[in-house]
Amino acid sequence: MLPMQGAPTYDDIVLKREMPVHKGGPDPEKEDRVMLTRHRVSRILFDTKFYDYPISLKPETFKNFGVLTTLRVGFSYLGSMFHKLPEDNLENFYINCFGRKLYSMFFEYYTENLWGRHPSEIDASWGAQRTKGLSIMGILKDFFGKLFKVKNRKVNTSLIEEFKYPKLGPGQLWDVTAAEVEKLGGTIIKNAKVTKLHKNADNVLTSLTYEKDGQEFTMEGDYFISSMPVKDLVGGMNDVPAEPARIAKGLPYRDYMTLGVLVPKINLVNKTNIKTINNIVPDCWVYVQDRNVKLGRFQIYNNWSPYMIKDLEHTVWI
């Protein structure tokens, strides 16, 4: 939908950073319809100290831990290797992957704070989806792969160091997608409630009925895509069998609040070797796993795209 950048971004120019560009691609300094390549930095803020996300084997990690905690983490992981727990919940899954000590430090409280449930009450399959195979062993393999410069090594998605991002943020991607759908003959209906689905003799969906502004409409189509929660979608259908309807009705949902704040500065010191505009911390995400605050994580939009902040030199958007 959005072509890759063919020239450096504003911050890469100012900081003289080299990032890959695509020959013939648009210049983000001149055009808006462009996808940027960004450096991925995400860290954990725990006990007022920064840790790599996911945890890495760097001297800074062990310095932050201290000798005693490092030993506890190591022996805890060894214990989890020889004594595997039944993976019938998320807590046991994390303990098997990282050891009980790391689990209690970085996963237990954060998970409960984010999802509103203790990990022991969440299915283990959720952990497999979230971590995508990441474990201490995976971190070790990645560490030695980098150390010995192993070519074509498989990189876990949680360890990827670059990502693609729309110049004006994710909303831009959906705006462009919507425009392309309509350009190709599709129809997008907003602020409407689907009330009935109509199928033919072969049980294929051919049309639907929806309500909008107090009126009822019927629409035919080859494909129907819904953006509403599955629970509400199934609840609005007229002929759902009892068992699927019961399952859909029981699906739990977790609401969260996103708050954008524009500030002149943040009181976090950039102690990394990564250059940034105004020397702010280079993180995209900061996962707050400190038990002293009721906060899951925060973004620093300056590091996602320099074009999303009006005064990049003097303000920070989090």
What is each of the regions a protein language model found here?
Residues M1-M81, K132:
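Dinucleotide-binding Rossmann-like beta1-alpha1 core, especially the glycine-rich loop
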Residues L2-Q5, F98, W115, M237:
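A broad structural signal for alpha-helix termini and local helix breaks/kinks
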Residues P28, M35-T37, K190, R254, ...:
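Short solvent-exposed loop/turn micro-motifs enriched in small/polar/acidic residues
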Residues A192-V316:
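Mid-domain catalytic core of redox enzymes
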Residues T48, Y94, T111, T177, ...:
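A residue-level signal for conserved active-site and pocket-lining positions in enzyme catalytic cores
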Residues K58-T61, F65-G66, T70-K199, T206, ...:
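Active-site/ligand-binding neighborhood in enzyme catalytic cores
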Residues P3, D123-A124, G260:
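A structural signal for the main folded, soluble domain(s) of proteins
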